[in-house]
């Protein structure tokens, strides 16, 4: 995922070694008077998934067990030092990845869980936009942009890391992806449907939306197909797990959830 800071300005003409760096902080001492100066930052470049930079950990789960029978979650974190991603696949969120002052300050992790609701599988992805400390609030709009831009990369990491599961159960590629943006700012506190997993891993070719992703608001009554799944109120066999494996989301974040009446829904439109 992209870092939350931008780089310094540098000359537009760089040698090959300099161009290979994502963030460049050095400038030439001698520059021509008319040489143009441009900002260089991966933040505004394309979101690209690199499998070689992904480390996958299976913690207490069967690589091929259907998530409709055994809880399955994803915890994805990014290192700004190594630029590598770590994906933990387990029955509950891997809290050890989220420890430490730096992780609590950045809050750039993405967590997700598979759910079966009334017999249909769906993937529920959670991102923390703001809330917790003032720095996150100050850069809420930028963080929202980055998460939207990088989410296709995140979803590709899930698909690549859990490829055996998806190979054995290809129907999971048709499962809807619901993205929860948690924020103490109403504008960014929302839920969006990014469509089937197979489509959500590809950013829209349209440049009209945030990060190349064009979303439009809709009401649950306008299209039943995209209605946010609601589990049965009583014990049943068609919903699993019976309770979310992420109870901390509702207790620690004053954000998304039907219980507080602040849900906003959106639908990602994939443009061909």
UniProtKB/Swiss-Prot annotation:
Induction: Induced by drougt stress in leaves and stems. This is Protein STAY-GREEN 1, chloroplastic. Pfam families: Staygreen. Keywords: Chloroplast, Plastid, Transit peptide. Residues 201-222 are annotated as: Disordered. Belongs to the staygreen family. GO terms for biological process: chlorophyll catabolic process. Required to trigger chlorophyll degradation during leaf senescence and fruit ripening. Binds directly PSY1 to regulate the accumulation of lycopene and beta-carotene in the maturing fruits. PANTHER family: LP06106P (PTHR31750:SF4), PROTEIN STAY-GREEN 1, CHLOROPLASTIC-RELATED (PTHR31750). It is found in: Plastid, Chloroplast. GO terms for cellular component: chloroplast. Plants silencing SGR1 exhibit a stay-green leaf phenotype during leaf senescence, and a red-brown fruit phenotype in mature fruit. Plants silencing SGR1 exhibit altered development of fruit pericarp cells. Interacts with PSY1. It comes from Solanum lycopersicum. The gene is SGR1.
């Amino acid at each position: 995922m992209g870092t939350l800071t931008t780089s310094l300005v540098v000359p537009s003409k760089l040698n090959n070694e300099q161009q290979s760096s994502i963030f460049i902080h050095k400038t030439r001492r001698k520059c021509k008077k008319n040489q143009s100066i441009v900002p260089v930052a991966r933040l505004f470049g394309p979101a690209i998934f690199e499998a070689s930079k992904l480390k996958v950990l299976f913690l207490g789960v069967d690589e091929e067990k259907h998530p409709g029978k055994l809880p399955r979650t994803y915890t994805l974190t990014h290192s700004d030092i190594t630029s590598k991603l770590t994906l933990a696949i387990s029955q509950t969120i891997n809290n050890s990845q989220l420890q430490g002052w730096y992780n609590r300050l950045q809050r750039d992790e993405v967590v997700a869980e598979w759910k079966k609701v009334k017999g249909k599988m769906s993937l529920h992805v959670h991102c923390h936009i703001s809330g917790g400390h003032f720095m996150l609030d100050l850069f809420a709009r930028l963080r929202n942009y980055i998460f939207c831009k990088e989410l296709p990369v995140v979803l590709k990491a899930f698909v690549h890391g859990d490829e055996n599961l998806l190979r054995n159960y290809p129907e999971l590629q048709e499962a809807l992806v619901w993205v929860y943006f948690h924020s103490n700012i109403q504008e960014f506190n929302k839920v969006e449907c990014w469509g089937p997993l197979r489509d959500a891993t590809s950013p829209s070719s349209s440049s009209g939306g945030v990060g190349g992703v064009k979303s439009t608001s809709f009401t649950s009554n306008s299209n039943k197909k995209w209605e946010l799944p609601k589990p049965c109120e009583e014990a049943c066999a068609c919903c699993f797990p019976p309770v979310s494996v992420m109870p901390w989301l509702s207790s620690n974040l004053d954000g998304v959830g039907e219980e507080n009446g602040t849900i906003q829904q959106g639908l990602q439109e994939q443009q061909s």
